[in-house]
């Protein structure tokens, strides 16, 4: 049952994190009449602009997080970022608060160690070889054992922060320092992984709903500086590899538990599939589903967490997204060229309405459909290139 917002019978959902992905979740919640409360560390974040009301707190502050949940008494608490005091969510779930998909899933996936050990050691899924390191001495030993090239990541970071590929062991100290600077906790434990010479990597959006597990068509993507630049759907792959990918995703999602959409990241090398990471929430590469599917990843997430069925997921055809990226410092961001960016058929834009920029920031995305994937990517890139960010 869903009541009208601002009434006694309202269904209240609290978003912990109000970026561009949270904004789309908020919009989908609004479409189904849910009262939305946005929470983030800064004012006027994208999802706050479409929420019924919002609060600014440090979500890593356990007392502040508990206080805001107790104040608002939401029926659903929906973490949309990793930088949250997850132990508080675990405690509050035990007290009866509904954490999406589960507090355990949120805590496990907040750091790479929890989810990697679950996937490799508990579920026995294929992954790259790895070591976790607390000191630079352990780090150097791990590099010697795994060999180069290898990948280094802070166990707690996002959007590529602190990640690097070591191709020369002489550069290990620089990689260690970069990882320490990029961690959300300001340094600490890192993972050293063997480099998988993959043919391609995918995001398999996997939905756990009241009527079972559902899969979106696989999404291919290109990364640069640890963050995505373009994504496309569907990624071409054999039936055998798709079946292996879906089997891995099902095991991970079922082990994490709860209802919702999960972004399962996988590497594909020949006929082999390797687990990489998982997010228990919509994934940035899944922004392409805003144009590629009848139900976007955000609509699917909301249906699932509200306990609603998903009869089918229709994919419209070859589609792509291309990031609108800017670099600079400003609290007065404007955009030119929007008309030119939308001249081609089957193109759309999403401008995230982020309030400011200080450095490099993703400010929007261009979306396109075409007769094949290459054409869709080209069209999305062309559309994105026409949007000029003015400071």
UniProtKB/Swiss-Prot annotation:
Belongs to the PurK/PurT family. N(1)-(5-phospho-beta-D-ribosyl)glycinamide binds at residues 20-21, 80, 284, 354, 361-362. Keywords: ATP-binding, Ligase, Magnesium, Metal-binding, Nucleotide-binding, Purine biosynthesis. The gene is purT. The keyword Kinase does not apply. The keyword Aminoacyl-tRNA synthetase does not apply. GO terms for biological process: 'de novo' IMP biosynthetic process. This is Formate-dependent phosphoribosylglycinamide formyltransferase. It comes from Shewanella putrefaciens (strain CN-32 / ATCC BAA-453).
